[in-house]
Amino acid sequence: MYDVIIVGGGPAGATAALYAHREGLKSLLVDKAIFPRDKICGDALSGKTVRIMRELELIDGLEQLDGSDINRITFGSPSHSQFDIHLKDSQNPRHITKGYVIPRQIFDHYLFQKAHQICETREGFTVKAVSYTHLTLPTKSSG
C-alpha cells in the first residue's frame, strides 16, 4: 500500500516523490519510458529549479552533471542597445541564482535515480486508468 502514486517520472514526478519522502510518505513512481530517455526541450534550468535542487540537497550532484552554467542573461534590442544581468554576483544585494543548461536525458535520469533511491519505481509501465477504491483525506482541527 502506498500513500502516494505518482504517474510520470520526469522532473515534476521525481521531485514530487522526493518531497513525499521528506514528509514520510511511502510512494510509487511510474513512467511509461525507461530511463535514461530523451525529451525535446531547451534544456535550461531556471533559478527556481536551482532553488528546489538546493532545498532537496541535490545541487552538488547537479553541478557534476554534463552541462553548462548560465552566469549572465543579456537582453538586446533592434537598436543594438543591451542590458546584462549577472546571475552569480553574490556581492549584489539583488543576487540572482545562476542557472544551468543540462540535456534533459541527463537531468531527468539524475532526478529519477535520486527518486529510485528513496521510493519504489516502475519503468516501462503505462497507466491506462485510475480506480479509486479507498480515498482518505487528512483533516486538520480548526481549534
Label each residue range with its predicted role:
Residues 23, 114-118:
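Conserved dinucleotide-binding and phosphotransfer motif residues
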Residues 117-127:
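A conserved beta-strand/loop element that lines the FAD pocket in flavoprotein oxidoreductases
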Residues 4-28:
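N-terminal Rossmann-like FAD-binding beta1-loop-alpha1 element of flavoenzymes
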Residues 133-139:
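Conserved small/polar residues in nucleotide/adenosyl-binding loops
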Residues 21-41:
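Glycine-rich FAD pyrophosphate-binding loop
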Residues 55-107:
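A conserved beta-strand/loop capping segment in the N-terminal third of enzymes
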